[in-house]
Curated annotation (Swiss-Prot):
One of its GO terms (cellular component) is plasma membrane. Keywords: Cell membrane, Membrane, Transmembrane, Transmembrane helix. The chain crosses the membrane at residues 12-31, 41-63. It is found in: Cell membrane. This is Uncharacterized protein BH0234. It is a multi-pass membrane protein.
Amino acid sequence: MMERIQELLEQIVKWLIFTILLVASISLIVVYQQGYIAEALVARATPLAIVVGLSAIAAAIIVKK
């Protein structure tokens, strides 16, 4: 029973990380498609780039596992 719960939690975490990666990537693309001006959009682009990078690392670790 506990193994089943642990397996279910792992699947939920995996899908959550991939969803975050997908949403952050799309958001970053949208920011760059809006006629990117570094001075105006750096406040949006930098946090999104960090989230995309960290979630990509987390996804790679999960896939390798």
